[in-house]
């Protein structure tokens, strides 16, 4: 039933956006920060990006920042899925961003495949980030600039953390 699906989607969105995440090892000892999440998406999308590539770049930004500073940028938790590490509730995050006119999140269907594009609709607010956070975002964006979605997925599958983690953990 469509109404039930809609209710569940709205309920999940409210839980995600209103939850007070206590800093833990799973979120990089950082409270969930919705504004930083969406501004990270805006920055990394740089107009338009494929969903798969965006989700990997978000993972690498949070994890590189954690490696260098013992905390993440966004407070997102990540899990292992077949195409690599992704933020928990990423569909909710992207759908909400689309509903709130922060991003355009749409499928692109070709004769051979279907994929999703994210296009930023807002201006990046660099004031939300520290100098160190901005440096990491820039480093990730530059490093993966010429990677396509498949290449970044393959790259992420070689990570020790990905190999050692069970699916959906």
Predicted regions located by residue number:
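Domain-edge interaction signal
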Residues: 3-169
């Amino acid at each position: 039933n469509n109404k039930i699906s809609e209710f569940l989607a709205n309920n999940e969105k409210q839980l995600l956006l209103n939850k007070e995440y206590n800093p833990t090892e799973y979120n990089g000892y950082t409270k969930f920060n919705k504004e930083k999440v969406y501004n990270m998406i805006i920055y990394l999308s740089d107009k338009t990006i494929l969903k798969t590539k965006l989700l990997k770049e978000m993972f690498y930004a949070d994890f590189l920042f954690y490696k260098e500073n013992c905390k993440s940028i966004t407070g997102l938790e990540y899990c292992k899925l077949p195409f690599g590490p992704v933020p928990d509730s990423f569909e909710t995050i992207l759908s909400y961003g689309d509903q709130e006119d922060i991003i355009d999140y749409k499928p692109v269907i070709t004769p051979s495949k279907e994929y999703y594009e994210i296009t930023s609709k807002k201006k990046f607010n660099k004031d939300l980030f520290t100098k160190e956070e901005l440096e990491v975002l820039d480093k990730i964006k530059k490093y993966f600039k010429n990677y396509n979605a498949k290449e970044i997925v393959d790259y992420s599958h070689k990570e020790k953390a990905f190999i050692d983690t069970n699916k959906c953990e």
